[in-house]
Amino acid sequence: MKREELAAKLLSLVTGIAPDVDPATVIPGINFRDQFDFDSMDTLNFAIELHREFGVEVPEAEYSRLASLDKCVAYLSDKVR
């Protein structure tokens, strides 16, 4: 899967968890928490959605690798085909 495709799918998952987020305003290198108050429950829900969508299980110890769109794409690009 191309990085752009992956980023678009990730944005869709983020907006499913945080419906007030406008995908056009997400800055890829800025942490979700800083941009739109993503809290620990949002991160857990995001990890669950990643598992549902891509079959990728993210251990809790690696949740920091899901902190921003750029980090998510980097983390998942090798795991998602």
Locate predicted features.
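Phosphopantetheine carrier-protein modules
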Residues: 17-37, 54-61, 65
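Thiotemplate assembly-line natural product biosynthesis machinery
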Residues: 1-23, 76-80
